[in-house]
């Protein structure tokens, strides 16, 4: 959810997020490729290897989105391109999973749909080594983010190096999204819905308020959805993305309708 908030700040778009912009899907494809290659050769994948692969995939997708953003003026077209990237990466991931050995297909399929069931304390420690410094860096950028939200011209007027700041936002958002995807697979709508729910709850859009709220709110939201996914139809376990979509998609619909009605009144 923190990655989603950073992307919403960077693109100035309320529905930007790792899943919608295709970043999570790019990370998923890279991790799936590494896992299939390693597993088919009887090798073990370390946490660092998965994080590195996910980050490379996330940055590749992000690079494509940024290239498209320079050619289009309408943000809606950029979002559609991001969604298409996600579909392409997901389709290629399915082809990759098809080449996995039979004993590994179930685990790979569950991971590719989004699941916390394969997480271990070793994974948590490895992710924490990356996520905590990234979040600390994001907190340090709170004041520049507040200025950037007022517009690039205003940010430059107060002495912010917009180009370097934008690169940091891209790097941090991709890194945070990659860490989650490396171990839990792509989890939809958390990065979009939670930042807006936090803003509504606290009645503030200040980064110093929203960022910690996203961290705590995203964790609570995912825990609740994971509990529902595991217990609602036990012993059958749903993918966590299917549950987050049930709660997150209405928030996105509300955002689109609210934004359209606001433009209509203007």
Residue ranges, per PLM feature:
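Alpha-helical transmembrane segments in inner-membrane proteins
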Residues: 1-266
């Amino acid at each position: 959810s923190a990655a989603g908030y950073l992307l919403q700040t960077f693109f100035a778009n309320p529905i930007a997020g790792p899943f919608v912009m295709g970043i999570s899907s790019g990370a998923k494809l890279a991790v799936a490729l590494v896992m299939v290659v390693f597993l088919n050769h009887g090798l073990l994948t370390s946490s660092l290897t998965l994080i590195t692969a996910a980050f490379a995939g996330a940055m590749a997708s992000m690079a494509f989105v940024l290239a498209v953003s320079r050619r289009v003026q309408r943000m809606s077209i950029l979002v559609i391109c991001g969604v298409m990237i996600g579909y392409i990466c997901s389709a290629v991931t399915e082809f990759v999973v098809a080449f996995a050995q039979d004993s590994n297909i179930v685990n790979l399929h569950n991971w590719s749909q989004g699941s916390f069931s394969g997480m271990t304390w070793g994974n948590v420690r490895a992710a924490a080594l990356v996520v905590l410094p990234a979040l600390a860096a994001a907190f340090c950028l709170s004041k520049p983010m507040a200025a950037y939200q007022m517009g690039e011209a205003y940010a430059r007027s107060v002495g912010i190096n917009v180009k370097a700041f934008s690169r940091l936002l891209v790097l941090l958002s991709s890194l945070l999204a990659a860490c989650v995807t490396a171990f839990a697979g792509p989890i939809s709508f958390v990065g979009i819905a939670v930042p807006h729910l936090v803003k509504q709850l606290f009645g503030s859009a200040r980064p110093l308020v929203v960022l910690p709220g996203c961290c705590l709110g995203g964790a609570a939201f995912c825990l609740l959805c994971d509990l529902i996914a595991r217990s609602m139809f036990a012993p059958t376990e749903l993918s966590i993305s299917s549950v987050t979509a049930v709660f997150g998609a209405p928030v996105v619909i509300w955002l689109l309708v609210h934004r359209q009605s606001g433009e209509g009144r203007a």
